[in-house]
């Protein structure tokens, strides 16, 4: 069973990147968010602030049993999770600063923007079994940020370091 995790990022949105890339699905999207229990590139929980084409917060569980790299799973295995309770996120414009925080305990996830809860729900028992570090994801968004994360209680040692390269 995964331990509780909490991650917070304070960021300033600077606008789109100079060069934009489509997602693996072919969709053009600008977004930024948090990874939780990131076992690897194929098995993790996302709390994503979609900037364009539509401003909203989306929580997804990406699960691909037996796959561990982006080359193995691509953009397969995503399941968007419906919240028990949700509220709108502000539309991001260049120059704005905000705080995005996610707290996951067992299969329950809470997401906050500027200390206001914007998403609360159950991500499922599959997500609760994932074990790995927190991180960030950014697609076509230019940001400056500070990431804060507490070491989960009861953990020893370090997780695998992030690697540069193509993501999905």
What are the residue ranges of the model-derived segments?
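Surface-exposed coil/turn segments at beta-strand junctions on protein surfaces, enriched
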Residues: 2-4, 27, 91-95, 129
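Carbohydrate-binding surfaces in secreted/extracellular proteins
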Residues: 9-11, 92-126
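Surface-exposed loop/edge segments in extracytoplasmic proteins
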Residues: 43-44, 116-121, 158
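Activation corresponds to long, low-complexity, non-globular regions
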Residues: 157-168
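Short, aromatic/His-centered strand-loop micro-motif at the edge of beta-sheets
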Residues: 67-99
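Hydrophobic residues embedded in beta-strands of well-ordered beta-sheets
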Residues: 55-58, 109, 143
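Flexible glycan-contacting loops in extracellular carbohydrate-active proteins
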Residues: 121-149
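Secretory/extracellular carbohydrate-interaction modules
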Residues: 1-74
